[in-house]
């Protein structure tokens, strides 16, 4: 039995990290009787440990709440818990497209932040009804009136009827539920039309196979039905239809406006693309839903096991993670310095950190991560054997012959940064140093909102950490890609004892190459232990060395056992030592410890 359309409310919660989104979701579940107090654990919807610890939501989750409103009617409220971080922007856009409205949760002490803004604008684009909720009003530092003014000034939403709440103390929860029923519109859709449903998310369950989260737009979906994924062009048989309350409950069928899950004996998440349209295989709908796009990795880096024997374990672990997260890619690669490993592609830096942390934590692996790099476009001129063409470069070590390169293009982003006035100067300097182009600067209350265009290459390294450190953690930052532009870029190689170390090679802007190279050489000089012979550490572009440091040799005092007597005896011993050192330098291997790699890749303030 499907639920009548006018009794359904689909909504998401938009909030910046730590503004209380998951806690509010917990309270709503508790208030509507989804779980008893005993079963309630903090952050019910955040399943991964990392999600709970970092206080972030990575995968979209959903829960169906039954609520008896004050008008005496029973309503079904579907809450979509969306990721709040910029790396998962596409997942957010699909989750928002599955709803008709949103709760905008803003911390009463901290006010509106950059990520909130990005998601609110997406929500407004979907024509959502937005209900502002000012959370944490019981904090001593809470300033609800100031935050209301911020919501009106920055976002342009009327905030006089914002709900004041404290999810932690349970204040204002009933008012929020009533506001959802009264202000968020009911979904539309024709139950008799051919099935059209949106694939919102999918994850792998060891018992059920791939579980697919869907929002039915038109028609009905039931057990035993043959369905077709329109983008993937595959046909499957539905063997389960259900919803989360948040415990799994099986349903016979789902109609328009309903959100729930299906399973269809699918083995790999990679077959289920987020945003795909699901329809009836026998009676398909004419048009797929708009807005689908392939998720492309943005940041690439190499992952190598510290112990070479862990290579197979790393491969298995990556396959297992891939079951749950089709948005990252990997392929095997080998490096002279680090042995065998994988070149992995991620949606952004947070995504990279999360995958890395899950590998260390859940699969107990010790890993070395090479410098993150972005995808460059190389325009190659024609040679005797090949025509002119454009190629994508993921790994600086694969750079072709510089003489063939006509032009290198790099990805650029538009960043929106909020920062308190007193840190504005150092923030502008940081953006300037990173080749940023200032587009806009406005003041809201005591904070500046700055819009900058920046090369993504300059941001992936340590921009976020520097931003947080110069603003004492008060700045918030959000970005989106704006396409490729030509750049004066060169490949910088690091050579130790005349041998290039491929794991440390990187693509840099020509103007910054010398400073970056000098910094890297100084760093390695301190990190590589002394050997019995002199070791030159050089940074080079092509054949030209742009920076050099020398690690002095350890010296054994060979003349210690000579007492007085003839000076030629001493000279003979010293000459012999000199010969030995020369031979050693030619054939000796320099042992670079793993810590040196990791520390060298973490550029400091001067980088």
UniProtKB/Swiss-Prot annotation:
Enzyme Commission identifier(s)? 3.6.5.n1
Q: How does it sit in the membrane?
A: Peripheral membrane protein
Q: Where in the cell is it found?
A: Cell inner membrane
Under Gene3D superfamilies, the record lists: 3.30.70.240, Elongation factor 4, C-terminal domain (3.30.70.2570), Elongation Factor G (Translational Gtpase), domain 3 (3.30.70.870), P-loop containing nucleotide triphosphate hydrolases (3.40.50.300), Translation factors (2.40.30.10)
Q: Pfam families recorded for this chain?
A: EFG_C, GTP_EFTU, GTP_EFTU_D2, LepA_C
**InterPro entries of this UniProt entry?**
EF-4, EFG_III/V, EFG_V-like, EFTu-like_2, G_TR_CS, LepA_C_sf, LepA_CTD, LepA_IV
Instruction: Supply the PROSITE patterns for this chain.
Output: G_TR_1, G_TR_2
Stretches assigned to the tr-type G domain: 6-188
Instruction: Kindly list the cysteine pairs connected by disulfide bridges.
Output: none
Q: Which GO terms describe its cellular component?
A: plasma membrane
Annotated residues for binding of GTP: 18-23, 135-138
Q: Offer one example of a GO biological process linked to this entry.
A: positive regulation of translation
Keywords annotated in UniProt? Cell inner membrane, Cell membrane, GTP-binding, Hydrolase, Membrane, Nucleotide-binding, Protein biosynthesis
Catalysed reaction, written as an equation? GTP + H2O = GDP + phosphate + H(+)
Which GO molecular-function terms appear in the entry? GTP binding; GTPase activity; guanosine tetraphosphate binding; ribosome binding; translation elongation factor activity
Task: Determine if Cytoplasm is one of this entry's keywords.
Answer: no
Main location per UniProt?
membrane
Q: Into which EC class is this enzyme placed?
A: hydrolase
Family, per entry: Belongs to the TRAFAC class translation factor GTPase superfamily. Classic translation factor GTPase family. LepA subfamily.
- HAMAP family, from UniProt? LepA (MF_00071)
Its job: Required for accurate and efficient protein synthesis under certain stress conditions. May act as a fidelity factor of the translation reaction, by catalyzing a one-codon backward translocation of tRNAs on improperly translocated ribosomes. Back-translocation proceeds from a post-translocation (POST) complex to a pre-translocation (PRE) complex, thus giving elongation factor G a second chance to translocate the tRNAs correctly. Binds to ribosomes in a GTP-dependent manner.
Entry protein name: Elongation factor 4
């Amino acid at each position: 039995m499907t639920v009548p359309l006018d009794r359904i409310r689909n909504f998401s919660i938009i909030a910046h990290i730590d503004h209380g989104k998951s806690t509010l979701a917990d309270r709503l579940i508790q208030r509507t009787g989804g779980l008893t107090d005993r079963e309630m654990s903090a952050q019910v919807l955040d399943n991964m440990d990392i999600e709970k610890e970092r206080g972030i939501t990575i995968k979209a989750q959903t829960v169906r709440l039954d609520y008896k409103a004050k008008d005496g009617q029973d309503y079904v409220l579907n809450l979509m818990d969306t990721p709040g971080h910029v790396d998962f922007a596409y997942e957010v856009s699909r989750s928002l497209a599955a709803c008709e409205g949103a709760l905008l949760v803003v911390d009463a002490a901290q006010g509106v932040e950059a990520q909130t803004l990005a998601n609110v604008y997406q929500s407004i684009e979907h024509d959502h009804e937005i209900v502002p909720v000012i959370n944490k009003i019981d904090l001593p530092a809470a300033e609800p009136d100031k935050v209301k003014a911020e919501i009106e000034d920055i976002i342009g939403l009327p905030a006089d009827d914002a709900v004041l709440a404290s999810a932690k103390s349970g204040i204002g929860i009933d008012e929020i539920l009533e506001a959802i029923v009264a202000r968020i519109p009911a979904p539309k859709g024709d139950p008799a039309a051919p099935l059209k449903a949106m694939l919102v998310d999918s994850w792998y369950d060891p018992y059920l196979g791939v579980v697919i989260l869907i929002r039915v737009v038109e028609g009905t979906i039931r057990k035993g039905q043959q369905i077709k994924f329109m983008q993937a062009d595959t046909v499957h048989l539905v063997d389960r239809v259900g919803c989360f309350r948040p415990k799994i409950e099986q349903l016979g069928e789902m109609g328009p406006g309903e959100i729930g899950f299906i399973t269809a004996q699918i083995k790999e998440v990679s077959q289920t693309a987020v945003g795909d349209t699901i329809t009836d295989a026998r009676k398909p709908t004419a048009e797929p839903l708009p807005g689908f796009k392939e998720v492309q990795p943005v940041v690439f880096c190499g992952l190598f096991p510290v112990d070479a024997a862990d290579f197979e374990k790393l491969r298995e672990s990556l396959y297992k993670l891939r079951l749950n997260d089709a948005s990252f890619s990997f392929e095997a690669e080998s490096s002279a310095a680090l042995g065998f490993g994988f070149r992995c592609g991620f949606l952004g830096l947070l995504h990279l950190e999360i995958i890395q942390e899950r590998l260390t934590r859940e699969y107990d692996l010790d890993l070395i991560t090479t410098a993150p790099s972005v995808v460059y476009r190389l325009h190659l001129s024609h040679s005797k054997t090949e025509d002119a063409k454009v190629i994508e470069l993921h790994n600086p070590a694969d750079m072709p012959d510089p003489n063939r390169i006509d032009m290198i293009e790099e990805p650029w982003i538009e960043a929106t940064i909020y920062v308190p006035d007193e840190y504005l100067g150092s923030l502008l300097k940081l953006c300037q140093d990173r080749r940023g182009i200032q587009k806009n600067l406005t003041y809201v209350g005591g904070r500046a909102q700055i819009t900058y265009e920046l090369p993504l290459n300059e941001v992936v390294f340590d921009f976020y950490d520097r931003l947080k450190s110069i603003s004492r953690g008060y700045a918030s930052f959000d970005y989106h890609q704006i396409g490729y532009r030509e750049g004066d870029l060169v490949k910088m190689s690091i050579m130790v004892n005349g041998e290039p170390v491929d794991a440390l090679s990187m693509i840099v802007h020509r103007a910054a190459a010398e400073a970056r190279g000098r910094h890297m050489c100084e760093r390695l000089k301190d990190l590589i232990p002394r050997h019995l012979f002199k070791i030159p550490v050089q940074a080079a572009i092509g054949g030209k060395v742009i920076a050099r440091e020398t690690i002095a040799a350890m010296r054994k005092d060979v003349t210690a056992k000579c007492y007085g007597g003839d000076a030629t005896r001493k000279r003979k011993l010293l000459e012999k030592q000199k010969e030995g050192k020369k031979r050693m330098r030619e054939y000796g291997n320099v042992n670079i410890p793993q810590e040196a790699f990791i520390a060298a890749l973490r550029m400091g303030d001067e980088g």
